[in-house]
């Protein structure tokens, strides 16, 4: 049984990150994979495939009224959900209510033949039609537990798929100016962007992680002016950069230049002169400022790279804006648009006719004084991403801050002007603000950077794991408050601690089982038949669809939410089901005979059941570790 990919392509711009889970699952990407879905695990995806096949069979048999094959929705829109009440079964479908009107039948009348066909499927214990036409499905224990064998066989790759394969996604994130340390907003993009890249790769995509250094233009000039002022002990310029890091870098420039035989403080500070390459300096420049710029910007680059490395974020490409000018790419991009009829001259300036492609106004790209507008580099950069020799992007994903919302129109217009499809070849994600809190009050000050909190400040306060997890677990469209006190605590209210503790607890169960001589070799998974067992099995079965959905929605926060739900289910299971025999406590020994015997049975499972539970325990451990790794967070074995 295979899926027709061409009928089920889900475009990114057709699914919003805030789509509710139940609705989004109807668009889940497993139906996009074009690969057979094994029914031996009877996962939600397998049930959807089975229900689709039954629908077509009922049409062929004339048992579905006026329904025809073309009226049956694709598999990804056939909802299979987890009932809130376990008494209603393991899974439920509303297929009969979806199709009843098209079939010209009452929902319950259409549900009956569906239920009869489902009841004959291997791995299904019982099927019941309930209410107006819901179909409740109960799996047999062995079928429900088959997911455990699948997890142990596939390991950390369980749930990975190839439905985003065949395309190269260029994911640009952080891209902070090299004028200071990474601030808290950039830190959020580092956590979200790297996690997103990992999730996309788990869905088969080829991902190019890219950092764009804005090392051209006025901000770099302001940075250099600030350094010169600091080097001379002068007040920072009104539009300059402040903070202890400015003093530090200024001194490093002085020391480095001195080692090279250059007395940087005695270079001319007046306008004019030439730069390091012998080119005339423009108005507002000076030899001294150019020397500071030339030496300080690489220092800032190095510091940013080190911060990213310490945050477990790596990039495939570190792209320098200045190279677009040096290599003539800006001129070539403008020439390309001119050939396409989207460039004109007016008032001594060169304009991009972006209104031809949906923007609210045309944009200047070469000012009347002959200098390039900032947007000129944006145009050249997108063209470079799409047509570079190494790993050209099929999809260019930009992760921008909240202050860039006004850029979307012009960026999408530029995409369309090059003959590409906005929302398809270019995707823009806008992130919201981060507030850092301590003792219930906002934290505004950094040791080095003045009135901002930096990536290094956050890591020093709570560690990499807590920092990354807390920033990645919230939808980037939503402002987030980072509570330093909470993240430093070892309590269940701390989400990263709660998930990591579930992994450490599972590892501890393994150690105790080994000490007790318990293994899961030859375990009979049909013995996983309690309500708590079933909840854990169902949670594991939902991981593949959730992972696929997170990739389609560009939503790594869904991985974190899944892990928290799985951890909660596991902790509950751990508290009621035993793997390793446990002696009764003194208060328990003093209970009446019947109560004491019930406790003894609960705390001392027979060997076969203990082996099955140990295997389930290991499956949970594997999935939690894999999920944490997608978020760049470690899975400790002891806590």
Residue map of PLM features:
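Non-catalytic interaction-recognition regions
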Residues: 2-145, 152, 156-158, 163-639
């Amino acid at each position: 049984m295979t899926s027709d990919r061409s009928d089920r392509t889900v475009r990114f711009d057709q699914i919003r990150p805030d789509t509710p889970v139940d609705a989004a699952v109807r668009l889940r990407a497993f139906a996009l994979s074009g690969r057979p879905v094994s029914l031996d695990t009877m996962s939600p995806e397998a049930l959807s495939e089975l229900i689709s096949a039954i629908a077509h069979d009922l049409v062929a048999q004339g048992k579905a009224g006026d329904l025809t094959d073309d009226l049956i929705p694709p598999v990804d829109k056939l909802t299979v959900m987890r009932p809130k009440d376990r008494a209603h079964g393991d899974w439920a479908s509303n297929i009969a209510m979806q199709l009843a009107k098209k079939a010209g039948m009452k929902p319950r009348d259409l549900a009956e033949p569906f239920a009869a066909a489902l009841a004959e499927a291997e791995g299904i214990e019982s099927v019941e039609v309930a209410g107006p036409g819901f179909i409740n499905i109960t799996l047999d224990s062995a079928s429900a537990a088959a997911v455990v064998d699948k997890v142990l066989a596939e390991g950390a790759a369980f749930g990975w798929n190839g439905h985003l394969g065949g395309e190269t996604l260029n994911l640009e994130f952080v891209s902070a100016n090299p004028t200071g340390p990474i601030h808290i907003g950039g830190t959020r993009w580092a956590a979200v962007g790297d996690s997103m890249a990992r999730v996309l790769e788990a869905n088969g995509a080829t991902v190019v992680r890219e950092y764009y250094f804005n090392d051209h233009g006025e901000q770099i000039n302001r940075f250099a002016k600030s350094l010169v002022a600091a080097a001379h002990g002068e007040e920072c310029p009104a539009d300059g950069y402040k903070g202890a890091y400015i003093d530090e870098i200024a001194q490093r420039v002085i020391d480095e230049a001195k080692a090279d035989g250059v007395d940087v403080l005695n270079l001319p500070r007046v306008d004019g002169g030439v730069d390091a390459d012998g080119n005339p300096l423009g108005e507002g420049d000076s030899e001294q400022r150019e020397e500071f710029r030339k030496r300080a910007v690489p220092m800032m680059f190095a510091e940013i790279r080190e911060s990213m490395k310490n945050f477990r974020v790596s990039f495939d490409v570190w792209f320098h804006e200045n190279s677009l000018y040096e290599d003539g790419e800006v001129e070539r991009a403008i020439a390309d648009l001119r050939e396409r009829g989207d460039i004109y001259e007016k008032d001594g300036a060169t304009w991009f006719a972006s209104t031809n492609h949906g923007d609210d106004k045309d944009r200047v790209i070469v000012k009347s004084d002959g200098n390039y507008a900032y947007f000129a580099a944006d145009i050249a950069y997108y063209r470079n991403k799409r047509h570079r020799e190494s790993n050209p992007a099929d999809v260019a994903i930009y992760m921008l801050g909240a202050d860039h919302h006004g850029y979307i129109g012009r960026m999408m217009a530029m995409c369309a002007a090059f003959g590409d499809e906005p929302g398809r070849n270019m995707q823009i994600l806008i992130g919201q603000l981060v507030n850092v809190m301590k003792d219930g009050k906002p934290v505004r000050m950094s040791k080095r950077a003045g009135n901002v909190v930096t990536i290094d400040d956050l890591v020093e306060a709570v560690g990499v794991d807590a920092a990354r997890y807390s920033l990645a677990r919230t939808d980037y469209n939503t402002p987030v408050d980072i509570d330093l006190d909470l993240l430093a605590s070892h309590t269940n209210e701390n989400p990263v601690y709660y998930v990591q503790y579930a992994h450490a607890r599972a590892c501890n169960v393994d150690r105790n089982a080994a000490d007790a001589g318990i293994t899961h070799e030859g375990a009979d998974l049909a013995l996983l038949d309690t309500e708590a067992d079933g909840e854990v099995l169902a949670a594991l079965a939902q991981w593949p669809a959730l992972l696929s959905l997170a990739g389609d929605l560009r939503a790594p926060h869904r991985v974190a939410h899944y892990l928290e739900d799985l951890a909660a289910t596991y902790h509950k299971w751990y508290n009621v089901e035993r793997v390793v025999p446990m002696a009764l406590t003194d208060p328990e020994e003093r209970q009446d005979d019947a109560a004491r015997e019930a406790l003894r049975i609960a705390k001392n499972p027979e060997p076969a059941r203990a082996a099955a539970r140990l295997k389930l325990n290991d499956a949970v451990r594997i999935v939690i570790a894999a999920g944490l790794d997608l978020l760049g967070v470690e899975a400790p074995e002891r806590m």
